[in-house]
Protein backbone atom coordinates (compact mmCIF):
# COMPACT_ATOMS: atom_id res chain seq x y z
CA UNK A 1 0.00 0.00 0.00
CA UNK A 2 1.47 3.36 -0.96
CA UNK A 3 1.41 6.55 1.11
CA UNK A 4 -1.57 8.03 -0.76
CA UNK A 5 -3.62 4.87 -0.30
CA UNK A 6 -2.80 4.92 3.42
CA UNK A 7 -3.92 8.55 3.64
CA UNK A 8 -7.20 7.74 1.85
CA UNK A 9 -7.79 4.78 4.15
CA UNK A 10 -7.02 6.87 7.22
CA UNK A 11 -9.36 9.63 6.03
CA UNK A 12 -12.11 7.03 5.53
CA UNK A 13 -11.55 5.75 9.07
CA UNK A 14 -11.67 9.27 10.49
CA UNK A 15 -14.83 10.00 8.48
CA UNK A 16 -16.48 6.88 9.91
CA UNK A 17 -15.51 7.91 13.45
CA UNK A 18 -16.99 11.38 12.89
CA UNK A 19 -20.19 9.89 11.41
CA UNK A 20 -20.50 7.58 14.41
CA UNK A 21 -20.00 10.50 16.82
CA UNK A 22 -22.71 12.50 15.01
CA UNK A 23 -25.11 9.54 14.79
CA UNK A 24 -24.79 8.70 18.50
CA UNK A 25 -25.90 12.25 19.29
CA UNK A 26 -28.58 12.45 16.57
CA UNK A 27 -26.98 15.61 15.19
CA UNK A 28 -27.20 14.79 11.47
CA UNK A 29 -30.66 16.40 11.44
CA UNK A 30 -28.93 19.77 11.93
CA UNK A 31 -26.33 19.26 9.20
CA UNK A 32 -27.51 21.17 6.16
CA UNK A 33 -25.40 23.30 3.83
CA UNK A 34 -26.29 26.59 5.53
CA UNK A 35 -25.59 25.46 9.07
CA UNK A 36 -22.43 23.57 8.16
CA UNK A 37 -21.12 26.62 6.29
CA UNK A 38 -21.93 28.80 9.30
CA UNK A 39 -20.25 26.32 11.65
CA UNK A 40 -17.13 26.37 9.48
CA UNK A 41 -17.11 30.16 9.50
CA UNK A 42 -17.55 30.30 13.26
CA UNK A 43 -14.76 27.80 13.86
CA UNK A 44 -12.49 29.77 11.50
CA UNK A 45 -13.32 32.89 13.53
CA UNK A 46 -12.42 31.02 16.72
CA UNK A 47 -9.08 30.12 15.13
CA UNK A 48 -8.58 33.81 14.33
CA UNK A 49 -9.42 34.63 17.93
CA UNK A 50 -6.41 32.58 19.05
CA UNK A 51 -4.24 35.33 17.56
CA UNK A 52 -6.29 38.40 18.49
CA UNK A 53 -4.12 41.04 20.18
CA UNK A 54 -1.13 38.69 20.11
CA UNK A 55 1.84 38.17 17.89
CA UNK A 56 1.61 35.15 15.59
CA UNK A 57 3.76 33.05 17.92
CA UNK A 58 1.85 33.89 21.12
CA UNK A 59 -1.22 31.79 20.33
CA UNK A 60 -1.89 28.72 22.47
CA UNK A 61 -0.80 25.72 20.41
CA UNK A 62 -3.43 23.47 22.00
CA UNK A 63 -6.25 25.95 21.32
CA UNK A 64 -5.03 26.46 17.74
CA UNK A 65 -4.97 22.69 17.22
CA UNK A 66 -8.47 22.34 18.67
CA UNK A 67 -9.90 25.01 16.39
CA UNK A 68 -8.14 23.62 13.33
CA UNK A 69 -9.51 20.17 14.20
CA UNK A 70 -13.03 21.63 14.46
CA UNK A 71 -12.63 23.19 11.00
CA UNK A 72 -11.44 19.90 9.54
CA UNK A 73 -14.23 17.93 11.24
CA UNK A 74 -16.93 20.24 9.87
CA UNK A 75 -15.28 20.13 6.44
CA UNK A 76 -15.36 16.33 6.50
CA UNK A 77 -19.00 16.31 7.66
CA UNK A 78 -19.93 18.75 4.88
CA UNK A 79 -18.11 16.75 2.21
CA UNK A 80 -19.59 13.47 3.40
CA UNK A 81 -23.13 14.88 3.64
CA UNK A 82 -23.05 16.02 0.01
CA UNK A 83 -20.99 13.06 -1.23
CA UNK A 84 -18.00 15.21 -2.21
CA UNK A 85 -14.72 13.39 -2.71
CA UNK A 86 -12.26 15.42 -0.63
CA UNK A 87 -9.21 14.13 -2.47
CA UNK A 88 -10.78 15.02 -5.82
CA UNK A 89 -11.88 18.46 -4.57
CA UNK A 90 -8.45 19.31 -3.22
CA UNK A 91 -6.57 18.13 -6.30
CA UNK A 92 -8.99 19.98 -8.59
CA UNK A 93 -8.62 23.19 -6.57
CA UNK A 94 -4.82 22.86 -6.53
CA UNK A 95 -4.91 22.56 -10.31
CA UNK A 96 -7.03 25.73 -10.56
CA UNK A 97 -4.65 27.54 -8.22
CA UNK A 98 -1.65 26.48 -10.30
CA UNK A 99 -3.27 28.19 -13.28
CA UNK A 100 -4.20 31.30 -11.28
CA UNK A 101 -0.78 31.53 -9.66
CA UNK A 102 1.87 30.46 -12.17
CA UNK A 103 5.29 30.13 -10.54
CA UNK A 104 6.86 32.73 -12.83
CA UNK A 105 4.38 35.37 -11.60
CA UNK A 106 3.52 34.27 -8.08
CA UNK A 107 6.81 33.06 -6.62
CA UNK A 108 7.69 35.18 -3.60
CA UNK A 109 4.65 37.42 -4.09
CA UNK A 110 1.64 37.90 -1.82
CA UNK A 111 -0.39 39.49 -4.62
CA UNK A 112 -3.78 38.11 -5.55
CA UNK A 113 -3.98 36.56 -9.02
CA UNK A 114 -6.05 39.52 -10.23
CA UNK A 115 -3.07 41.79 -9.57
CA UNK A 116 -0.63 40.01 -11.90
Residues covered by each model-derived region:
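Flexible "arm" and connector segments at domain edges
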Residues: 2-68, 72-116
